[in-house]
């Protein structure tokens, strides 16, 4: 899928960016010892992508959290379908949820749109390929999501192959 250390660094950076010195709202609203169960459900029909990334965000923030995937990457989900459950410290769940949801929503969106294009060209002798035009730091996730949607990866980075464009022929 991807080098473990790359995903770990991406998640740590995302959590550091969002949490900073701490989640002041959760700290003010909770005692800190509450436990709970969170459920992630699909708000619309979609193609799942990034479900393990979603879980890894919670586990990175708090290894004691228990994550259970209910759908796998590449599967279709209908509106209201259960995608995953997270149980444990309510403070940890609330602190990690926005980063986890942002990554999951982005990846599912890419996979869903890719699948729509792949379905449109079914039966033709062509493939849907991605590009390097991704948000900095999120390329591994974006390209993974394309594959989950049935598309193919082109070049991962500049080192990955020669592609002469008009900018090179000046």
Segments predicted by a language model, with ranges:
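Acidic/glycine-rich phosphate/pyrophosphate-binding loops and surrounding catalytic core
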Residues: 1-170
